[in-house]
Amino acid sequence: MPRTRGPNAASRELEEAHERLAKKDEEIGQLRARLAQRDASRRGSGIEPENIVWIFCSGRTGSSWLSRMMGELEGHTVWFEPWVGALVDPYHLQLDRRKGAHFILSSQYRATWLASIRSLVLDGADARFPETGSKDYLIIKEPGGSVGAPLLMEALPESRMIFLIRDPRDVVASWADAHKKGSWLSADEGPEASAERARRAASRYVRNIGQAKRAYDAHRGRKALIKYEDLREDALGTMKRSYSQLGVTVDEGELSRAVEKHSWENIPEEDKGEGKFYRKATPGGWREDLTPEQVEIVEHIVAPLLKEFYPESQPNVGG
């Protein structure tokens, strides 16, 4: 017969559990106090968390163009692809499966490692951009690291964010061109490899954009959603609207000059075209660039995102 615990033993276990929880709450409170003290001590001498503007997106969505326009403005500095978000990639780390206390990102120690992520970003920024003042803005262009966007925004909730999106079919078409023989990424591939690359590119897009959207939806601070297609149609108007949503005041004349300087029309012709980094900049160009097989593959993988952000674009699957 299994022995049953008496009421005294059960009471002691419950009391011990309460003590452990109280101790954990005390540790978290102390950690938050240290974090606040740390931020207070660095205030006025480095980049302020609320002056960080993240650009979360996927590759080939126009983030280089956007960040260069923003970088032209007074008091703006661009941190070009630090990949810090890749360090907390939920897919690679299997965050939904690893629950043990010994796991470095265990939920039991969330406050501890969020503080570490925060310090990594702020200290890394201060070390790289010591000339950037407390009133200046740091634009962090983070396409590859967008997979870690939710945790980055949780660690730095005061920061602002731009969610940059582009039709995934155009994104895949751009990557397909980049990997052709003689192109700027110089990779030769046959028809089978081309189909597989489309599948991988679409899956990568879903991971990065999906996590960026998750961060955008959860963020309660200043944020802006920018579509690449809107930038191409009216870059100045889109930039004005986005800065207003971000709560950042900029000089309209300076902004207009930045937009003009980095317009598609002002890129030298020899730097544009197929096989070049600046390839096409034509929304909907995927209709000419992708094979029917590639289109079907991509539209199947990205269907929910297409439905939400490009509902006017009817999938070509089966047609």
Q: Regions from the language model: what does each represent?
A:
Residues 84, 92-93, 133-253, 264-277:
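PAPS-dependent sulfotransferase catalytic domain
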Residues 69-70, 155, 218, 289:
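Conserved catalytic core of Hanks-type protein kinase domains
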Residues 3-124:
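PAPS-dependent sulfotransferase catalytic core
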Residues 1-53, 176-179, 185, 209-217, ...:
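PAPS-dependent sulfotransferases, especially Golgi type II membrane carbohydrate sulfotransferases
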